[in-house]
């Protein structure tokens, strides 16, 4: 596939991976992005020359770091050379030309990244057939 779809140029850049951690459940429950997928993505982007690979999430129902550890994701990130970040610090991005919204609040790691990659979990939803990356 790499020959058909060339990888992005990440050389010397900071990459932020955004997996989906719904709750602190082990991989066999298939609730979160599989930790092996996250670890492989960290490894791949570093092999492609990324300066740094950050991985972060902000689950609504659990402490982010505890949830990442419970899913096995945290160890995969660290073991493959990545860095876990929490989305606790916020920044405000001003949009003075906006018609309805004049500013947006984002987790600061998004501003620290040159490239953002969504590693969403394919799953169903009570109001949708499937969510894909819609909620990530």
Role assignments for model-derived ranges:
Residues 1-136:
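N-terminal and secondary-structure boundary signal
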């Amino acid at each position: 596939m790499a020959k058909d779809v060339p990888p992005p140029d990440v050389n010397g850049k900071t990459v932020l991976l955004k997996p989906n951690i719904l709750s602190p459940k082990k991989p066999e429950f298939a609730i979160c992005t599989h930790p092996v997928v996250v670890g492989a993505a960290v490894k791949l982007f570093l092999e492609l020359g990324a300066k740094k690979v950050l991985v972060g999430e902000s689950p609504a129902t659990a402490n982010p770091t505890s949830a990442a550890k419970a899913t096995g994701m945290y160890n995969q990130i660290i073991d493959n050379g990545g860095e876990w970040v929490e989305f606790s610090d916020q920044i405000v991005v001003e949009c003075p030309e906006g018609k309805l919204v004049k500013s947006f609040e984002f987790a600061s790691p998004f501003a620290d990244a040159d490239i953002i990659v969504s590693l969403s979990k394919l799953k169903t939803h009570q109001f949708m057939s499937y969510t894909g990356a819609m909620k990530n």
